[in-house]
């Protein structure tokens, strides 16, 4: 089910504060480390790099224009797919 149009997109407060601090200070664009996979990508995030936790390690995510409106967690996969079990004796 989609999010209601009455509500604004969700971003964790601590993440937004970090982004605004980087934008205001014009500081070097260091990666922002976050565990907030549920946060929606805003247009202010374009050009920034986030390190999103996937449960095991931090994955670098460089935000581009096409990613706006998606969640950060969509770009840091949590599972690895090794293929379906194959019969080794079958040819």
Swiss-Prot record:
Pfam families: Ribosomal_S19. GO terms for biological process: ribosomal small subunit assembly; translation. GO terms for molecular function: rRNA binding; structural constituent of ribosome. GO terms for cellular component: cytoplasm; small ribosomal subunit. Keywords: Ribonucleoprotein, Ribosomal protein, RNA-binding, rRNA-binding. It comes from the Bacteria. Belongs to the universal ribosomal protein uS19 family. Protein S19 forms a complex with S13 that binds strongly to the 16S ribosomal RNA. This is Small ribosomal subunit protein uS19.
